Amino acid sequence: MHKLAVSALAALAFSGLVQADARIDLGDAQRVTRLFAFPNNCHVICFRDWTLEQTVEHYLTQSVRRDGYANAQVQVSRNSDDHVQALISDVPPSYAEPLRQLLDSGELAYQGATRLNKDGKWAYDWYLFLPLGMALENRRSIELLHFPPDYSLTQAQDYLRSNTTDRWAQLLTFNGIDASQTPAYQTIVDIAPIAAPASAGKDLEGTYTYFSDYQTRMVKQMTLRQGAQPLPMVAFGAPVRSWVQQQYGPKVNVLGLVSISPQAGSQVPVLGANHPSAIWYAADKNNTGGDQDKADAAGLKMMGQDLTAACWQAGMGRNPNAGAKLTLEACATKWQVTQKKQTCELFYRTIRDMTPAQAAAKCNTGSVTRSLRDLRKPVEVEL
């Protein structure tokens, strides 16, 4: 899915604003090297033989495009003091501030990674990877995830290019979000800012405490906005939902709605969700004793939950003033009751790779119809 496209509507929305230039001193080359994971993909031979300046330009250009600044240009240079500076044209002068905040938070992640390595817990195939290249201004919702897969850094050099984010972007489009706008809903905070092999989840469980300062600062910076409602957040997967409970108090179940306070006096709505990739495991017949019907039933159940969570995220992102509980109840009714046949068809189309006609026929069979009767999961709310 091409996530850098900017819709005409978004471009028009920004065209009426008075733009100028944003300038930011990113720090000395040593600092920028570690915060931008430079070089991203070199092992004697570089997959992309970019300089440090080209690497920074790449990620900052991703950000300005995802913020809707279609005409903005990014120039990165190094001065005589070996400081790396960025000039971004046709954006508000204030545009530099969220970037500065992100990199300052990144220093906390670097400090945590350094301690982790000192304690002998850093793996040879891990990379410190901050959430670079995402929208800095045009944020609609926050996604709290576990860790980025290594190929997002080494191959794609795009934090939003992964099977996980691609699938969730698709679910957002099923809930009325234009494909060009999904990056605004997918501002990611990973509790382990480590690009690692997809199989490394268990190994990363002992790393979270090293990044506590980074994690809590990022959640606060990303969700809270001056003079506006906090952005809604979705917590994906069991490790992340457990982290929310340990850090903020309330237990977060799948489709469980809670409220956290990243800062005194603030309340951020948080919805628990499955990990976006969990459905492929749940719907694998090798995990149900070879029983295909049982695997399909498990996948259908999870598809209903995932569509409900994406619906809530889309609705709250469009209107942060909407009632979190009412939005969740409406979404659950839609995808698990009134439109459960569509939920079924989307499951067979996207997970089983059926054609629309094949999916429609499958959803009319007796075994699937019986599974759909049990699709509804009670909504758990703790506010």
PLM features per residue range, with description:
Residues S15-L17:
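N-terminal signal peptide c-region/cleavage motif recognized by signal peptidases
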Residues R23-P232, A238-Q245, N274-Y281:
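A polyanion-binding, active-site-adjacent surface
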Residues R23-S77, D81-D82, L204-D213, Q245-E382:
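C-terminal capping/extension of enzyme domains
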Residues H2-L9:
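Sec-dependent signal peptide recognition
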